[in-house]
Every structure is written in C-alpha cells, then in structure tokens.
Amino acid sequence: MVGRGKGKGREHVLLVVFPAQGHISPALQLAFKIVAHSSIDLTFLTSSSAVASILIGLPPTAPALNFAAFSQGNLHNDDDDDDDAKDYMHTLCKHGSQSVRDIIHSTKKGQGQGQGQGQGQGQGQGHPITRILYTTLLPWAADVAREFRLPSVLLWTQPVTTFLTFHYYFTGYEDAINKVRNQQGTEDDSTIQLPRLPLLSSRDLHSFMLPSNPFKGAINTFKEHLEALDAEETPPTILVNSYDALEEEALQAMIPKYKTMGIGPLIPSSVFDTRETTCEVVSLVPDLAQKSKDDCQWHGWLNSKAEGSVIYVSFGSHVKQSKAQTEEIAKGLLASGHPFLWVITSNEEEEGDEIMEQNLVEEIQEKGMMIVPWCAQFQVLKHPSVGCFMTHCGWNSTLESIACGVPMIGFPKMFDQPTISKLIAHVWKVGVRVNAAVDGIVGQEVIKNCIESVMDPDGIGRELNENVRKFMSLGKKAAEEGGSSHNNFKAFLQDMTGGTTTIN
C-alpha cells in the first residue's frame, strides 16, 4: 500500500532508456516498482522498435505505464564497423534529445504524449515532467534536463566496478590503465590495483578500453557521463543495478563524490519465488530477441533430467560465435557427458546456412540434447535440473544466475563482460572463466574442463555452489523489506515526493 500526504504537485518522471535488452530489462523493472509503490506518473521513452516489442510482450497484469518512442536509426550487425556505431549514436542523440524536449513541452501544455498500456491509457500523461531518469550510454539526457532546470538521475545498468574503472581512467589513472591495456595479446600479465577494486589485467578491462576495440569513439560516451554528473550543482544521484553485499567495496568508493544507491537486483520478483517454475510463468520483461512464440518444449525436456545435471548455454542476443567457435563449444559440451540446453539465436543462424558441421548437429540430436532459438531464461535458471550456466557474462544474465543459485562458466567477448567475468571467477567465486588460445578460439578441452570443474560435487564445484547460494540469499535479503536495496529504493521515492510517499 502507498500513502501520500499533501504537498507539492504530482510527480511525473521521464525514464529515457537505451534501446537494448540489457538496459530495457532493468529499466522496466524499476519503472514497474515506481508506479506500483507510489503515486508517481512515469513515461518510458526508448526507440520505436523497442516500444513495439515491449507492448506486444507485456502481459495485461503489468503495472500501467506511459510509453513514448523516438527513431533510433539502423545499426548493422558488423562487429567492427566503427562508422556505423558513430552514426547510430549520433542518430540516437539527435532524435532522442528532441523527443525529450517535445515531451517536456507537451506535458507543460497538458498535452500528454505516448501510448498507454494496461487498462486503457496510462494515467497522468498531462502532468508536467518533473524529473528525468536515464540509463547508461545516454548522457545527453542529463544535458536536456539541465536545459529545463529539471533534476536528473542516472540508472547505471552495468556493475559499479565498471563505472569506477571509467571514473579512474578519466581522473588521473589513464596512463597506468593504458600501460596494462597495451599488454593485450602479449605474454605480459601486468595488473593494476585501482582503489577499492580487484587486481585487473588487460583481459579484465571493458572492451572499450582495449587497443582491439573497433568502436574507437565509444569510450568518449563514458567521459560524457562523468562530465554530465560533474555539471550537477549538488552531488548527483546514481541508481545502480547492484546491491551492497555484492559490490560493497565499489559502492563505498563512490560515496564521497556521488549519491550512489544500490537498488538491485532489478529482476522479476518471481525469480526469488522458491516454487518450481513452469513454462507458463509470466515475466514482466519482454525479451526483444524473441522472434517467435516459445513452444515450451524445453520445459518438458528439463523435467526429464536429474537435479543439477543440465548445462544451460546462452550467449545473449547480441553475441555471435564464429562457426569454428560454435563447433568447439559443441564438442566440449558433448565430451562432458552432461545433458545441455543451448540457445542459438536466429541472428546466429542468419550468418550462414550452417552454424556447425552436419555431423555435429546429428550427434547432438542422436544424444537427445536440445538446441532452441529462444527460451525464457530466468524460468530455465530456476529449474532444479539446471546445474551450470555457460554465459557471455551480460550483467542481467549474471544477476539472474546468482538470484537462482546457479554457478557459471564465464565466456566473455566484449563490453563489460570481461570485467563481470573477473568478478564471477575471482571475486565472488561463483563460477569459472574460459581461456582462449592465441587465435582467440576457446578449445573443446578448455570447455570440457570448465564444465567438469563446475559440476564436480566434491571439488571446486562444491565451493562455487556454496558461494552462489550465499549471494543468492544476500540478494534476496537486499530486496526484502528492511534490506539495503529496499531501503535505498524507499529513500529514492521519498526524495522524489518530498517525503510524502511511504511503502508498507
């Protein structure tokens, strides 16, 4: 229940979201929490294609939000097209910032924009925008907020550790980090000890920092984030999709400069439900990568497997493996002797007629293993038969795996994934990490050995399971009433409403 006292006018938040699954998922969770626990109106702004996918996938039971959209342009699937990425970000900034201005103007005039969702139109579309929330990679949203003298809040959708790495890079540690990053691809194993962070080598850094990074201008976006925060007249608020027990040292390091509030994990609350999942469980976060209705065959298949015996393999919606790498993964999985459920997206299949040699496909089929184009990930991770998650180490996937108590095999490729893999394997010790050969391919023996390590009930596997269950419990406690994330979220709501909102 929500109590609201008398005071200032109705609060209307504009939440501006980068149009990618890793940003939309936590942003939607935050949006739902805000409208469910307060009288605050909220407009969710992202690209037109993302809004279309969200509206198709949202169940009627989802809390009502207003949705608005901007054009995002086109980003091709080339992994090394720097010009294409620059054009995309420029288009995003141009159309996105103009949409923010238009919405602010229209709500001032009482002409609400956007599409309602749920039971008819969303409520409060005519109330003026009073605050802007924006996700990672959209620093221009804070600039527009300042144009209108509106407060802005950053929703950081990566680990706090990643934020700090960029912060240090642009505030005196650039030369030291460059010395380490320039060792990429060499035998040198130099590391750097940044304040209150784990030792980092070149293989642990965000890919935007590395010489091999194809998107040369991308790192400037993070510099713009810091500049936008520094431009605030009062200590800026940063909401982070993490929790105190998971990144305690990193969160403490943020305190002197930023008002940082861990409100994670921003995942469906049903993840913490101890009841056995079914295929029909509804998620309030549509998957933008889902291109067809889930036939749920995977659920019956999982039901037929022993507890903790299945390897779940998924590398997210944007990571594509080469044919050579896919074949090594297949051989390693088959050699492990464990049943596996492997998500190979339609994007990967579109790269060519064959994702692997036909004889491997036939062997996988003969042994009764399962390959699917899509499945409801958190429902899979909750299933008792799943004992290991081979993951690209996206932040949402990592938080979901921890919340479900499933240890991981880190298979990072780009962005924040190497840093997250470092945290998984060496800081939290809830998984292991693959090592690639000189040619960049992770061999079948490495994959097989990683599986054996995680699935070993008497060796390292036991320790990994104990650790992941510990952090699962700590995450659940953080989200519960009186927990750190619950209290931070409550404080954030009260800050927005002048202390007039209470959560029971």
From Swiss-Prot:
GO terms for biological process: anthocyanin-containing compound biosynthetic process; pigmentation. It catalyses: an anthocyanidin 3-O-beta-D-glucoside + UDP-alpha-D-glucose = an anthocyanidin 3,5-di-O-beta-D-glucoside + UDP + 2 H(+). Predominantly expressed in petals and weakly in filaments. Not expressed in leaves, stems and other floral organs. Keywords: Glycosyltransferase, Transferase. UDP-alpha-D-glucose binds at T157, Q377, H392, W395, N396, S397, E400, D416, Q417. Pathway: Pigment biosynthesis; anthocyanin biosynthesis. Residues 111-125 have a biased composition (Gly residues). Pfam families: UDPGT (PF00201). Catalyzes the glucosylation at the O-5 position of anthocyanidin 3-glucosides to form anthocyanidin 3,5-di-O-glucosides using UDP-glucose as sugar donor. Anthocyanidin 3,5-di-O-glucosides are molecules that are responsible for pigmentation. Involved in biosynsthesis of accumulate gentiodelphin, a unique polyacylated delphinidin-type anthocyanin, in the petals. Also acts on anthocyanidin 3-O-(6-O-malonylglucoside). Much less active with hydroxycinnamoylglucose derivatives. No activity in the absence of the 3-O-glucoside group. InterPro entries: UDP_glucos_trans, UDP_glycos_trans_CS. Residues 107-126 are annotated as: Disordered. It comes from the Eukaryota. This is Anthocyanidin 3-O-glucoside 5-O-glucosyltransferase. The active site is at H23 (proton acceptor). An anthocyanidin binds at H23. GO terms for molecular function: hexosyltransferase activity; quercetin 3-O-glucosyltransferase activity; quercetin 7-O-glucosyltransferase activity; UDP-D-glucose:delphinidin 3-O-glucosyl-5-O-caffeoylglucoside -O-beta-D-glucosyltransferase activity. The gene is 5GT7. Belongs to the UDP-glycosyltransferase family. PANTHER family: GLUCOSYL/GLUCURONOSYL TRANSFERASES, UDP-GLYCOSYLTRANSFERASE 75B1. The keyword Electron transport does not apply. Its EC number is 2.4.1.298.
